[in-house]
């Protein structure tokens, strides 16, 4: 018996990984990044079952901002944002020539790598990623954003912001607050996602997805620059 192959099959079956890929990372102006992250997903999928949930980013915000001129229904506007996440997901999935699932249940049944966007109004793509991780009993959840992890305040606005290498889920929930309700809002991780991560005790990493080496390190369980969310 080839023990190396047996071990590899074991890894693929047990170390399912969900990645929440922030919409800020996916842009029509940065096709090289999209190709590079797709190649990383392709490579890592040989060793792990990968599920990638893509955010709406600038595209979602632009459409939601425009639609606010005609509508102030947050649930309706959120549907527009979901369509933007799916456009971004389709763009990434085009590398694999794959369709994207529209529900967590569909995603769980699809052959990996799975690429998807948002699902239902009121849930950010981070929340969708957390729900998917819980549904498939993923080994870990990686939140790839455009900052180096979780800070005590917004590092884009405060030069003295301090990054947490590790933070408890309880402290994180206190920092974030209880609600995420306005369509198009952008936060590192929202309250609904936090609640799911806390309840399901999902091993969660937050890092800068622009640095693909750090993302690869996190996928493969190596040391990375970011924040570990402690749920115990």
Task: Please provide the spans of the model-predicted regions.
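C-terminal catalytic "cap/lid" subdomain
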Residues: 7-232
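Intrinsic disorder/low-complexity segments
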Residues: 1-3
């Amino acid at each position: 018996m080839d023990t190396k192959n047996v071990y590899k099959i074991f890894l693929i079956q047990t170390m399912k990984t969900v990645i929440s890929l922030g919409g800020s990372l996916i842009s029509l102006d940065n096709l090289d990044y999209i190709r590079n992250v797709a190649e990383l997903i392709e490579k890592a999928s040989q060793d792990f079952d990968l599920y990638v949930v893509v955010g709406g980013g600038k595209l979602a915000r632009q459409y939601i901002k425009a639609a606010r001129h005609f509508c102030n229904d947050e649930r309706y506007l959120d549907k527009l944002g979901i369509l933007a996440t799916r456009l971004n997901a389709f763009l990434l999935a085009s590398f694999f020539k794959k369709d994207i699932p529209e529900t967590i249940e569909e995603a769980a049944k699809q052959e990996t790598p799975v690429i998807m966007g948002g699902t239902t109004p009121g849930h950010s793509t981070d929340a969708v990623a957390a729900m998917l991780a819980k549904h498939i009993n993923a080994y870990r959840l990686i939140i790839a954003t455009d900052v180096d992890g979780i800070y005590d305040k917004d590092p884009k606005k405060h030069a003295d912001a301090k990054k947490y290498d590790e933070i408890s889920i309880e402290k994180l929930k206190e920092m974030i607050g209880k609600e995420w309700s306005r369509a198009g809002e952008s936060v590192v991780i929202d309250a609904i996602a936090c609640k799911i991560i806390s309840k399901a005790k999902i091993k969660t990493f937050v890092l800068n997805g622009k640095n693909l080496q750090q993302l690869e390190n996190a996928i493969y369980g190596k040391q990375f620059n970011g924040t570990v969310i402690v749920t115990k």
